[in-house]
Amino acid sequence: MCSAGELLRGGDGGERDEDGDALAEREAAGTGWDPGASPRRRGQRPKESEQDVEDSQNHTGEPVGDDYKKMGTLFGELNKNLINMGFTRMYFGERIVEPVIVIFFWVMLWFLGLQALGLVAVLCLVIIYVQQ
């Protein structure tokens, strides 16, 4: 009869790596542990920080799916979290309004009221028009 520990280890008592694969089996298959190998070469998923480094070193010119992951700013982090929670981007022609801006608009409306928000909106439109 095997103990619970032996069942979890596979019952053969051989050495196992963190994924539960027998090291002897991996060595025989030619996929043994190499201290200098990258996580992908060892058959593991890279950690998120390593993934960020790999994404930032992507010089092929391909667009990165989530540019907020690279930004690391408060705006980017809040926006990424809001999108993950289910908020969507609003599209106005070629302009995109991010969820952070929509939430900011509603908070400003709540604090300042409609007249002050209208004044701020007109000022923003004038600034955008002057910059073009």
Swiss-Prot record:
InterPro entries: DUF4605, FAM241_domain. It comes from Homo sapiens (Human). PANTHER family: DUF4605 DOMAIN-CONTAINING PROTEIN (PTHR33690), FAMILY WITH SEQUENCE SIMILARITY 241 MEMBER A (PTHR33690:SF1). It holds the Pfam family DUF4605. The keyword Transmembrane applies. GO terms for cellular component: Golgi apparatus; intracellular membrane-bounded organelle; membrane. This is Uncharacterized protein FAM241A. Belongs to the FAM241 family. It is found in: Membrane. Keywords: Membrane, Transmembrane, Transmembrane helix. It is a single-pass membrane protein. Residues 1-68 are annotated as: Disordered. The chain crosses the membrane at residues 100-120.
